[in-house]
Amino acid sequence: LDGGLDFETLALSCSAGCSGCCDRVGAACWSQASPRVVKGRFDSNSYPVPSRGSDGTSDVASLYQRMPPERGRPAPSLESQLAVTLPATAEQSRGTQMQLPALRNSYAQLPERFFAQTGPQPVSEPRLIRFNRPLAEELGLDADQFTSPDGVEMLAGSRFPEGLQPVALAYAGHQFGNFVPQLGDGRALLLGEVVDVNGIRRDIQLKGSGPTRFSRNGDGRAALGPVLREYVVSEAMAALGIPTTRTLAAVLTGDPVHREVRLPGAVLTRVAASHIRIGTFQYFAARHDTEGLKILADYAIERHFPQLSGQARRYRALLDAVVTAQADLVARWMLVGFIHGVMNTDNMAISGETIDYGPCAFMDAYDPGSVFSSIDRVGRYAYANQPRIAKWNLARLAETLLPLMSTDENEAVAEAEEVLRSFQPSYEAVLRRGFRRKLGLLTEAEADLQLAADFLDVLARGEADFTIGFRRLGDDLDASEGQGTARQLFRDPAAFDAWSVRWRERIASETADTATRRATMHAVNPKFIPRNHRIEAMIQAALGGDFTPFDEILRVVSHPFDEQPEMKGYADPPRPDERVLQTFCGT
């Protein structure tokens, strides 16, 4: 916007893949997502870190002077960190024992500056809303233990077994383009880790469990509404096949939280591959703590990308792996019309999972400029801007890794820029493959992406529903030209009819039978998404003590591709009086 682009132009140019404003070095313009990194100096909008020079900037060269990339204390191996068995049975003050499984915490074995240890904070009346038994089974956890009175108290953050090492993680981050050198888990606690049935290590974290050292005068609590929203949306994303954190449980605390009004308090139990964020790396870079950066990077490699451990240029390989994971993730968001709403660098996990469902939303009518977050006043995180912002965030990650990649600054910058340039082709490859399947195209043709783009244009001009539009294409495979249910979405179907002729000609060029094609389309075009008006109605009902809508929508979106005729109302778009125009973080 500071480059003279109005929002409408920016949204359209983002949608078209225009790179006209992407050539500035550093972070001077929030809208650019340059595959370049700051060289020699951190821009004042990028890293307002300690030890500033007279010109108001900070010298990145000092990051190199602190410690060469292959020296300093190495991070202990993940297995060695987990070698200590933590006892899980504790004698409590009321004379009972908490019989709960041991949760080991490898992150708590890192240096103390990585986190803040935090104990339990009692709540008045913890009450289980819902426990995710299928997920517990996947994690190898005993659901009966966690749903026992002792288990519910732990899930509320009210009591912990002896030996548990709950920690709040330190991190920094760019929030709407402005760098904050210390954020951290202000209302979350990492309880520990489990290894699931697939051999994957997963974090168990409480969200809304009370204040920590990073709360910044906040109450550290979560209201019921945002907890239920994250439960439903995260489980919907998992069912859609999109990498995401999961929800193990939701618990009422019995205590109120005060936002604009008095609301019931709740705690969410989040499961994640890890909680390492781009902002975690920024935290150490901002402090010129190259030793901390190296420990963090080595830990991240061993935890998420162990195949990189023996590589000579493993930090470049780490950046490359994160770039690839984020390109894949954001493309998948775009394919289902998901808008994260707050793509700050502290809300991007290096694991490639969707994390931090605050003011998130799914589009109803297709509009590339869709913004729902009440705090996103200029559309920084609009639907069409998401791939651009992801690139911008990854450039900030690359800046933190420069001193680890090479002792030669020019060489490090060149390597980082080369890796960042791979984002766009990786993103576009996933997008092309996804839209081809959404259109029922089983072979590749050069014009397929244009065919998809033209359908999106038809949807936009007709203000037609994104999810229903694609789903009905599969329903209409047997329909005659000029017939079918998809064209009923348009007041004037002429543009759709013209596009449909081209689409049917493309389909006719393939030999697949209709049943196979429809099955392919219905496997990627959901019938159900967690629509914003349904989420809002669910929250309002729960605030009144009725959790039936919560149970219903959770059941529906857990099977998004099934017809579920008895629940067909959940597939309908909102009436004009039901439309949700803004979503809120709840902090």
Predicted regions and their residues:
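Intrinsic-disorder-associated, low-complexity terminal segments enriched in Asp/Asn/His/Tyr and depleted
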Residues: D2, D6, D23, D43-Y47, ...
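Periodic, rod-like helical contexts
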Residues: S13, D43, P50, G56-S58
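Regulatory N- and C-terminal appendages and interdomain linkers associated
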Residues: R94-Y171, F372, R377-T587
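Conserved ATP-binding subdomain of kinase catalytic cores across diverse folds
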Residues: E125-L128, P134-F146, G151, A156-G310, ...
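ATP-dependent phospho-/nucleotidyl transfer catalytic cores
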Residues: P226-V227, P256-H340, S351-Q450
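Hydrophobic HxD+1 residue recognition
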Residues: M343
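Hydrophobic residue at the +6 position relative to the catalytic HRD Asp in the kinase catalytic loop
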Residues: D346-M348
